[in-house]
Amino acid sequence: MNRLGKSMFRLAVLAVLACVPGMSAHSQDDPAGSVTLVATPRLVDPDYRGAVLLAVPVDNNRHVGVIINRPTGRSLSSLFPQHAPSKLVRDPVYFGGPMLRQAIFAVVHIDRTPGPGSIQIMKELFLATQGTVVDHIIEETPNEARYYVGYVAWRPGELRQEVDRGLWYVLEADPDLVFRKDPARLWEELLRRARAVTAGTPGRLSIVAAFSKD
């Protein structure tokens, strides 16, 4: 890849760590508390209607996450045509959330942190937020990650309030959901599962007590 293409890509893939609430102080070493969020029918905001999110707590009772069932239909190489390694990425880019839509984030399957500013979501699964780290993932292990434009962030205690208002079902985090090849039916599938949980159906999953009441 030529020098111009690489520099343009790194400008577009912003070093956003300092802009992401709760991510500037440290990377999370203990992934306990990561959850799958399933939008309930009460949630009518177009950004979140029918959405499934992977969310993780960070510092100061904040949470961040990405929407995992919204493929954009655009390839990474179509967004960055001068960035040759992007052509190796097979899956489409996903819409991760309404915040920082100009930035690319990655959820990567790897047995160690991929680089500075990355947050461990669960065992061998990390959210990469810095542009240089995302760039490195694309160049070295392009198909061990899923790439997102934008992300979701909650202020301290905000997600707890949304759950209490009945906007989200909360299920255990599942890394397999992130890499589903066809997520078109994922929301309906998890909605049925979540309703079975709340109804006390035999064989139900446990709802995760993931949020502080503070």
Tell me the role of every PLM-derived stretch.
Residues 1-12:
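Bacterial N-terminal signal peptides that target proteins for export
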Residues 25-214:
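A short aromatic-anchored loop/beta-hairpin motif
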